[in-house]
Amino acid sequence: MVIVSRYAQGAKSYDDDAITAFGNKLFTTSISLLHGFHYTDAMVIYRIYSTKLIKELDLDKDESYETEEKLFGTNISWEPLLSIRAAKRGLKIAEIPGDEPARDGGERKLQVLRWGAAYMYQNIREIFVWK
């Protein structure tokens, strides 16, 4: 899997504010420490991977998300879980620097507290489940 990192050397996110920058740093650091791969951007959507990886890592199964989604009343994306499970499997992972442009109109739909709680719960839960 190749990740286009907003925080790798020379790259910048022009869409981040103080809260999202802090959250990305917090989750990327915790995923790196808990699951064994040093990421610079474990949350980003910009990635290249084989579609068979989705099935290999059970990302296509509702049970991979349903506990967090029910507990915190929100839908979450698979990018953090993809980062976690790829690291746990010891898969080839590379990061390349890439800028994230500023948001071009529209409103951010970020649910900071719900998503933050759901992703942290998922991150910790993955220590004990899905081998």
Regions found by a protein language model. Give the residues of each.
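Histidine-centered beta-alpha loop that forms part of the nucleotide-sugar donor binding/catalytic region
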Residues: 6-7, 76, 98
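Charged/polar positions on well-ordered alpha helices
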Residues: 85-88, 118, 122
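A charged, well-structured terminal subsegment
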Residues: 127-131
